[in-house]
Amino acid sequence: MALKIHDAYKKGDVLAIDRLLGKKQFDAVIALDVIEHLAKKQGYELIRKMSWLAKQKIIIMTPNGFYKQDPYDGNKWQIHRSGWTVDDFYKAGFTVRGIRGLKWLRGEYATLKWKPWIFWGIVSVLTEPLVYFLPRLAYQLFAVKEIES
């Protein structure tokens, strides 16, 4: 049996979240694989707006650096418009961890570059503890910013 955890959904422009939702309305505001689909300037705007919405923290997950990604299945919103680095997040006050294994193992759409995929998938998993503490080597970044009250 699934728990009902959401009562209402809002659909709209992610850069208009401050107009759709109230200030400090959520304990945490999370953007998973979103920010890279915005231009860099828009990404920083999103971070500011997420900070406005959050009481305690904001969490962002994104590829480490720029990865070319074209429209998928005709969806123009799948295009990557920016790349984000550990230093980008450090400068914005985030703590950063690495996830999804070594950066050079994956390519477009986060797919493993080489076959057999099972072998390279195991290699990716085995490198997770390393990239967690050395996020510059990771394929994906997990960035957390504590909001000061």
Could you say what each language-model-derived stretch is?
Residues L20-Q25:
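Glycine-rich phosphate-binding loop signature in dinucleotide/nucleotide-binding domains
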Residues D7, D27, Q56:
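Conserved acidic residues
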Residues D33-H37:
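Histidine-centered divalent metal-coordination motifs
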